[in-house]
């Protein structure tokens, strides 16, 4: 990579979602409410799964890990965004920006791959129910969670090192509400061809492979459900997979909209709105999606409420 002699920036200024002062306090209240709901929803779901013996199954093991990732995912972005609504100059140090980008990439990648692991779990449950507890043994479940986390940490670390080894001297104003990759690359005075090639190769492999696992798993699941003779069995199978299908559709749909649209139609304001959806809204929605459509979770919650009363 060709470097240009210049003064390296020591901090970045985040433009944020809006520069209109009259909107900042209402947005602060809105996003604070969403974040509190996200924290309570995800940590509450983890606590519920850990304390109820009936939820001690592979499906809920994966769900508790997804809830943990959603909590961390949102916590990397939202607190800084809330601070940006309160301060006139929204600065973030060079090292803090690197840490935020690295953590964001790690948790986003982990969520993407965890959804694929959960799709495989649903495939085994529907297509091979008699062998479910054998195939999805505790050791296999741990591997299906550990592998996404290990891969995501390595990818995020390498990705972040590549990004912050570049020289930033054109400007230090990031047109976003957090340290994201593409807005940062617009500020560099280094050759970014290798970096961009790495982004597309790594993101393409991860996205296509995880999406392929989800797609193939659900093709087998739908085929198995359609072959069921009992209407009650089909309804139970669909209810088992419905929450995950909805979560997958929302998450991957947002990523496809965000990253696979033509570069000519890429607008920063559109990127910001899509980023708000998958960094703030999705972590809030997932506990609702998995709880409201899940009979066992609702029964466990009712049991806790009754015991307290």
Curated annotation (Swiss-Prot):
- This protein's GO CC annotations: plasma membrane
Stored PROSITE patterns: G_PROTEIN_RECEP_F1_1, G_PROTEIN_RECEP_F1_2
Q: What does this protein do?
A: Odorant receptor.
The set of disulfide-linked cysteines is 97-179
Keyword presence, Glycoprotein: yes
Q: Which PANTHER family match?
A: OLFACTORY RECEPTOR (PTHR48018)
For this chain, one GO molecular function annotation is:
olfactory receptor activity
Q: Which residues lie on this side of the membrane: Extracellular?
A: 1-28, 78-97, 165-204, 261-272
> Which intervals lie on the Cytoplasmic side per UniProt?
50-56, 119-143, 226-239, 294-309
> What keywords would UniProt list here?
Cell membrane, Disulfide bond, G-protein coupled receptor, Glycoprotein, Membrane, Olfaction, Receptor, Sensory transduction, Transducer, Transmembrane, Transmembrane helix
Annotated Pfam families: 7tm_4
**Residue ranges of coiled coil:** none
Q: How is this protein named in the record? A: Olfactory receptor 8U9
Carbohydrate-modified residues: 5
Which organism is this protein's natural source? Homo sapiens
Main location (coarse class): membrane
Give the stretches traversing the membrane: 29-49, 57-77, 98-118, 144-164, 205-225, 240-260, 273-293
Is-annotated flag, keyword ATP-binding? Answer: no
Q: Which gene encodes it?
A: OR8U9
Q: Where in the cell is it found?
A: Cell membrane
What is the membrane topology listed in the Swiss-Prot or TrEMBL record? Answer: Multi-pass membrane protein
The family classification in the record reads: Belongs to the G-protein coupled receptor 1 family.
């Amino acid at each position: 990579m060709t470097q240009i002699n210049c003064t390296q920036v020591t901090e970045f200024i985040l433009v944020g979602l809006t520069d209109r002062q009259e909107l900042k306090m209402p947005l602060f209240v809105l996003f604070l409410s969403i974040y509190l709901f996200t924290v309570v929803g995800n940590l509450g779901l983890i606590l519920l799964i850990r304390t109820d013996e009936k939820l001690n199954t592979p499906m809920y093991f994966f769900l508790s890990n997804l809830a943990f990732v959603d909590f961390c995912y949102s916590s990397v972005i939202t607190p800084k965004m809330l601070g940006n609504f309160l301060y006139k100059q929204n600065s973030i140090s060079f090292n803090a920006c690197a840490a935020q980008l690295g953590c964001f990439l790690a948790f986003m990648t982990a969520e993407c791959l965890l959804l694929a692991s959960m799709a495989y779990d649903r495939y085994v449950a529907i297509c091979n129910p008699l062998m479910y507890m054998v195939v999805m043994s505790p050791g296999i479940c741990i591997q299906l969670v550990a592998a996404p986390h290990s891969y995501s940490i390595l990818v995020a670390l390498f990705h972040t090192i590549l990004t912050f080894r570049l020289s930033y001297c054109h400007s230090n104003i990031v047109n976003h509400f957090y340290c994201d990759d593409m807005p940062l690359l617009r500020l560099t005075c280094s050759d970014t061809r290798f970096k961009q090639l790495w982004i597309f190769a790594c993101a393409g492999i991860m996205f296509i492979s995880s999406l392929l696992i989800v797609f193939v798993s659900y093709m087998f699941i739908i085929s198995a459900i359609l072959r069921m003779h009992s209407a009650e069995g089909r309804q139970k199978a669909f209810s088992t997979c419905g929450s995950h299908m909805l979560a997958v559709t929302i998450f991957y749909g947002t990523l496809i909209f965000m990253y696979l649209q033509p570069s000519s139609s890429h607008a920063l304001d559109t990127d910001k709105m899509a980023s708000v959806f998958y960094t703030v809204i999705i972590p809030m929605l997932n506990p609702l999606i998995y709880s409201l459509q899940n009979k066992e979770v609702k029964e466990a919650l009712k049991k806790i409420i009754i015991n307290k009363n």
